[in-house]
A protein has these predicted regions:
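Helical hydrophobic small-molecule/effector-binding pocket
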Residues: 94, 103-128
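Short hydrophobic/aromatic patch on the recognition helix
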Residues: 59-69
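C-terminal peripheral helix-coil segments that are non-catalytic and often amphipathic
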Residues: 1-17, 148-160, 168, 172, ...
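Basic, helix-initiating cap at the start of DNA-binding domains
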Residues: 1-44, 51-57
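Residues that mark the N-terminal boundary/hinge immediately upstream of a DNA-recognition element
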Residues: 50-51, 72
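Short, hydrophobic secondary-structure boundary micro-motifs
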Residues: 123-129, 135-136, 190-191, 213
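Alpha-helical structural segments
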Residues: 28, 32-43, 57, 75-95, ...
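Amphipathic alpha-helical packing segments from all-alpha helical-bundle domains
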Residues: 89, 125, 133-172
Length: 229
């Protein structure tokens, strides 16, 4: 694998509609409640946010929130987090379609995902003030939900360069790298810095993958730098 394969220029992702805007008002009640929950977490965290707070920001009644999420706060915040992850991954996937090599796809994906995590008010509030709330997201079940969503959205892009099984592996490794450095930060490693993201992505994802593929039969090994035919 050559040292450099270019990069993908990513535009800022469209922010989620904010409460009080026409775009927000045009959404369904469920969509407003999910977005309102994320807004509340970004301001007050999970512990201090009540269902009444979410209802007020969403512009609906408390009864509506409970009708949509009868199991209360745990169900609401779990659903809000999953919806937010799905929204961000879909937008990220659209922008990564311009990647011409696996290197560009992985490096740009890791860098962008880390940057988005750092810019999320809700996630940063939890990491700074309620780490005990953020910690369960590292559990096997919660992490698998995130990984499954990432594979569903991003693996088709990686399949341009490698076989489907390897594509899933690449996406999962990338997601794990971002999750690890987001929830267990290393003061010396900032994935929001593109050069650092490139170094980490190549060290922990691309180089091990290249070694694995090199150990396979030559006739079955696709190039990491060219689309598969």
């Amino acid at each position: 694998m050559s040292p450099s394969h270019g990069s993908v220029t990513l535009d800022p992702l469209d922010p989620a509609p904010r409460s009080g805007t026409p775009e927000f008002a045009a959404l369904s009640a469920r969509e407003r409640v999910l977005l309102a929950a994320m807004e509340c977490v970004g301001q007050w965290g999970v512990t201090k946010t009540t269902m009444d707070d979410v209802a007020r920001v969403a512009g609906c009644g408390r009864a509506t929130v409970y009708r949509l999420f009868p199991d209360g706060k745990p169900e609401l915040f779990r659903s809000a987090a999953q919806a937010n992850i799905g929204r961000v991954l879909l937008q990220l996937g659209e922008q990564l379609r311009s990647a011409e090599t696996l290197d560009a796809l992985v490096v740009s994906g890791v860098h962008a995902a880390a940057t988005l995590s750092a810019e999320s008010p809700a996630l940063q509030y939890l990491l700074d003030h309620e780490p005990h709330v953020a910690a369960p997201h590292l559990s096997f079940h919660r992490l698998e939900v995130l990984l499954a969503t990432a594979r569903a959205v991003l693996s088709p892009l990686a399949r341009q360069f490698v076989d489907p099984v390897t594509a899933d592996r690449v996406v999962e490794l990338g997601a794990r790298v971002v999750v690890t450095y987001t929830f267990l930060p290393d003061p010396g490693i900032d994935l929001c810095d593109r050069a650092t993201a490139q170094r980490i992505a190549r060290r922990h994802i691309l180089e091990p993958l290249a070694r694995s593929l090199d150990s396979s039969r030559p006739s079955t090994v696709p190039s990491l730098d060219q689309p598969t035919t």
